[in-house]
């Protein structure tokens, strides 16, 4: 499964949004309606899913789905 698809699954589950609402260009807060607590929970779920640690300083930079996918892709290399 591609990183985008795995991220999308986590986002759909954590934010209770429709799968077709999650696109690479979707902004987590603006487009998907997440609040700050949602973002924290989303980051924790992503850390668990991908078995990585995302420092708070990096998590703050994850604005869109593409930011998340690119960040996780970078960690997996």
Swiss-Prot record:
UniProt keywords, alphabetically: Cytoplasm, Fatty acid biosynthesis, Fatty acid metabolism, Lipid biosynthesis, Lipid metabolism, Phosphopantetheine, Phosphoprotein
Pathway: Lipid metabolism; fatty acid biosynthesis
Biological processes annotated in GO: lipid A biosynthetic process
Annotated GO MF terms: acyl binding; acyl carrier activity
Bilayer-spanning residue ranges: none
Annotated positions of the O-(pantetheine 4'-phosphoryl)serine modification: 36
Residue ranges annotated for the Carrier domain, each copy included: 1-76
Protein's cellular compartments: Cytoplasm
Main location class: cytoplasm
Free-text function comment from the UniProt entry: Carrier of the growing fatty acid chain in fatty acid biosynthesis.
Family of this protein: Belongs to the acyl carrier protein (ACP) family.
Protein name, entry field: Acyl carrier protein
Source organism: Campylobacter fetus subsp. fetus (strain 82-40)
Gene name of this polypeptide: acpP
């Amino acid at each position: 499964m591609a990183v985008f698809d795995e991220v999308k699954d986590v986002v759909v589950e954590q934010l209770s949004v429709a799968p077709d609402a999650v696109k690479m260009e979707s902004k987590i807060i603006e487009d998907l309606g997440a609040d700050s607590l949602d973002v924290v929970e989303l980051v924790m779920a992503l850390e668990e899913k991908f078995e990585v640690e995302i420092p708070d300083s990096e998590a703050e930079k994850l604005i869109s789905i593409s930011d998340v996918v690119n960040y996780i892709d970078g960690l997996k290399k």
